[in-house]
Regions:
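Active-site beta->alpha loop and helix N-cap motifs at the rims of alpha/beta catalytic domains
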Residues: 3-132, 142
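Catalytic alpha/beta core domains of metabolic enzymes, predominantly
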Residues: 114-117, 129-215
């Protein structure tokens, strides 16, 4: 979801946020990601992130599953954010690997395993190799053997890479709008896309048609 701000730029516009949630649900979307990259996650304060998750989950009120992004530079900070999202009622969390100075594969696995032990809700791993430690097919196989780790959002922009993730048997979301029809026909569980914010009916219709194999 995108994040609506007040006209003066000082704070989130909660009424518009709630209205946008209602519009998306009215269009038939199957779930919402709160504090997404599209929602300017990297530029939000911790208080704004907490508000988006808390107010979002409260307003959605069980009408659809909610995924809350809790990415952070350090594992301990990420665990704190993950627990807060779980306490707020999020259905799942979405977490990028450590970024800025990416660790080795061993460090990436440690990061996700520590978070998985700290919460009970599912974790969506977030592959953005342009911005963080890349998640490879082999690393993903190791990660999905850990309880709570199954889903991955692939925003690599490489359809062949997405297909490799699918072949592991894990559940894969594609995060690149332009690949939507091809990713869904290849077997992706779903899309986490920005376009749904301004054309939700078309996005839902595309997903449903492909799900029904009406290519």
């Amino acid at each position: 979801m995108c994040t609506p701000f007040q006209e003066n730029g000082k704070g989130i516009d909660i009424p518009r946020y709630q209205s946008h949630i209602d519009d998306l649900l009215g269009a038939g979307i199957h779930g919402l990601v709160l504090c997404s990259g599209t929602g300017e996650y990297a530029y939000l304060t911790d208080e704004e992130k907490h508000t988006l998750i808390q107010e979002g989950v409260k307003h959605i009120n069980g009408r659809c599953p909610t995924i809350a992004q809790t990415t952070a530079l350090s594992t301990n900070e990420c665990i704190d954010k993950a627990r807060a999202a779980e306490d707020a009622g999020a259905s799942a969390i979405m977490v990028m690997p450590p970024f800025l100075e990416p660790p080795s594969e061993r460090g990436v696995i440690y990061h996700y395993e520590a978070i998985a032990k700290a919460v009970r809700i599912p974790i969506v791993m977030y592959n953005v190799p342009q911005q963080a430690a890349p998640l490879t097919e082999d690393t993903y196989r190791k990660l999905i053997a850990i309880e709570n780790l199954d889903y991955i959002k692939d925003s690599s922009g490489d359809l062949l890479n997405t297909q490799k993730f699918i072949q592991t048997g894990g559940r894969v979301f594609c995060g690149i709008d332009s690949l939507a029809p091809f990713a869904l026909m290849s077997g992706c569980t779903g899309m986490i896309w920005g376009a749904v914010n301004f054309m939700p009916h078309e996005c839902v219709n595309l997903f449903n048609l492909i799900d029904e194999k009406k290519y």
